[in-house]
Amino acid sequence: MNDRVLRVLEFNKIKELVKGYAITKSAKEMVLDLKPYDSVYDVKEHLEETKEALDILMRKGNPPFEGLYDVKEAITRAEKGGVLSIEGLLRIGNMLSVTRKLSDFLARKEEEEEHRILEGMREGLIVLRGVESAISKAIVSEDEIADSASDKLYSIRRSLKEKNSSIRDKVNSIVRSNAQYLQDSLYTVRGDRYVIPVKAEYKSQVPGLVHDQSSTGATLFIEPTALVNLNNEIKELMLKERAEIERILAELSALVYKNIDVIKVNFNIIVELDFIFAKAKYGSDLGGTMPIVNEEGVIDLMDARHPLIPKDKVVSSDIYLGREFSTLLITGPNTGGKTVTLKTTGLIELMGLSGLLIPASENSSISFFEEIFADIGDEQSIEQSLSTFSSHMTNIVKIMEKANNKSFVLFDELGAGTDPTEGAALAISILENLRARGCRIMSTTHYSELKGYALKTENVENASVEFNVETLRPTYRLLIGVPGKSNAFEISRRLGLKDNIIEEAKKVISTESLQFEDLIQSLQEKSIKAENDAREAAILRNDAEKYKNRYKEKFERIESVRDNVYADARREAKQILDSAKEEADTILKNMRDLERMGISSDARRKLEAERGKLRDKISDAEARLQKKKEEQKGEELKKIEVGMEALLPSINQKVIVLSKPDNKGEVQVQAGIMKINVKAKDLRVAKETKEEKKIKKREARLNLRQVDPSIDLRGMDSEEACYTADKYLDDAYVAGRGEVTLVHGKGTGVLRKAINDMLKKHPHVKSHRLGEYGEGGTGVTVVILK
């Protein structure tokens, strides 16, 4: 596809909008490289992947991309065997975490619809729990290794804390004993060594090493001799800490290198998923649909909207071309909205052929074209000193050199910028030449000659954009089959031109021309009325179809529930009777054995006892059946309230009461997705089953496990981070967590401030603080919940 048409139809603006939904830099680059695909197979596959992603968005919400960064640079470094930075390892760890979460997110349950393309991509994801766990255990933030990264590091840092505590006690003692010689009563640190601010004139009173001085020279920063050994010990521990951190980074980098091929594959799949879901999110916000793609040159767009015009201002139109006619001429006055229709059609074609959902109703069709050409707008170059006509003709010449039967050609004001008679003749000749090649053509014009050409030429159709003479503005609704009317006289009258001048002008025009314009106006009025009638009929037809399907679904649901209830009852009754029969057979066998033993007094007693057992067993079976019937019937409701839960025995299902009893004694209830009317006296008290109680208890136990003790907000803007944190705090509070950690990173501090402001007003928060050394420092906030 030529770059000029992408620019002229503003496809680049669409890509910028889609890019805003992508997360990784690599996915954003994929969006910017997006253009129509070269084969109809590729077009259909990429549309299908976008539709699958939209289905998942609608059913499951946004995919778990939180905390994902582009790790292309880190992977490149790891491939060469280099040691990765803390930040690089953290990002790879986050990417592996996203891999695991995405694999779970995209897993299909049995009852869910199949998503062939995305499920195939999911199968390519390989979860590396060991690598992910090793990195997350060792790294706290972009610049901090956790104490628990190794036993040695833990030991070193514990010693560091002890030494720092000792030296602080020592230095405070020195400060107190030398207060008269000091510029300030506070110690400070220079070059990782504790020093005190001594007045220059008293330097001999405080023996030690001078490390620095103030800008005025009045203060010397001296390391007292008594602190030298302690400072040396701290320095040694810091060197050991640095060496251990470098060893840990090298070890983790080696682990990444060992799994680099899998990590690369995972990252490439995640980037592609990021790209696909960006398309789907844009399509969702646009209200887009997946078009039907054909190769016959047929365009059939229902309720098509220009995607760059705000929703509250855009007007939809039905646009079709390629079945009854191959060329559509949109005629009418300048500034009449014709160009918008032209751009809408071309841009929707580009979007669909690039795998994007289109702003049109379901079942709209686009055609696969090898090339789309457009001559729209006045793009002449001042440097080239080209006139409007010359500029357009230069573009048209290039189009004529390349267009074929697989091309869609768009002309804006074909033949304009020169003598009207010559321009119209040239336009007709160009259209005829392209039609002979089999091109599909849409062109705008205000020449009357082209209206006549369309009326008398086979496979060429007139169209116009409806114009409101009262407001002097186009409505932007396309009327196919009706040529455009200039409205020059009526517009002039509305603007205040005197009637006598208008009447004189009409005398100049031939009677045939005036009659033709009047005929056009009549056609427009009839076309608008017919279109409005057709729309109303379509709405009524759709409503009727919805009601038909809704009641059919209700009937099938009731039939299914009733059959299931009967089947369950028969099955349970059979189980009870089978059990009773089995035990009765055993008792009868025992009785026959006793009879064979003879009729001794002892045998008679045993025989009578077995008969008693048989009677008891049969009575018990009958009682159980009766009890089951009573249970199914349930306790009658004494009072009916709207919103209460009740049992409807006829379908053996719990329902929600939606209305009070009417004069017939009926109430409306909701059973699942159905709303039905039943007798109030048929409702029973709904009791919670043992199984439901078990499920609730099990869910309560699982809640705590399902909410992580921390959440990563890095990479989000303030608004998204506050929203995500707010939802997480709600979940953590419900799950019973007492303390959680919000990871926001250090950065510029903007995100940290926004989170802090949100926490001050949050109803579940008891208190909060910044993390301490080893917890993530100022890169995290620890929250205590109420």
Swiss-Prot record:
**Which SUPFAM superfamilies does the record associate with it?**
DNA repair protein MutS, domain III, P-loop containing nucleoside triphosphate hydrolases, SMR domain-like
Q: Which GO terms describe its molecular function?
A: ATP binding; ATP hydrolysis activity; ATP-dependent DNA damage sensor activity; endonuclease activity; mismatched DNA binding; ribosomal large subunit binding; rRNA binding
For the ligand (ATP), the binding residues are: 332-339
Q: Which GO terms describe its biological process?
A: mismatch repair; negative regulation of DNA recombination; rescue of stalled ribosome
Q: Does the keyword Hydrolase apply?
A: yes
Give a short account of what the protein does.
Endonuclease that is involved in the suppression of homologous recombination and thus may have a key role in the control of bacterial genetic diversity.
Show the NCBIfam families listed in the entry. mutS2
Similarity comment text for this entry: Belongs to the DNA mismatch repair MutS family. MutS2 subfamily.
Kindly provide the name given to this protein in its UniProt entry: Endonuclease MutS2
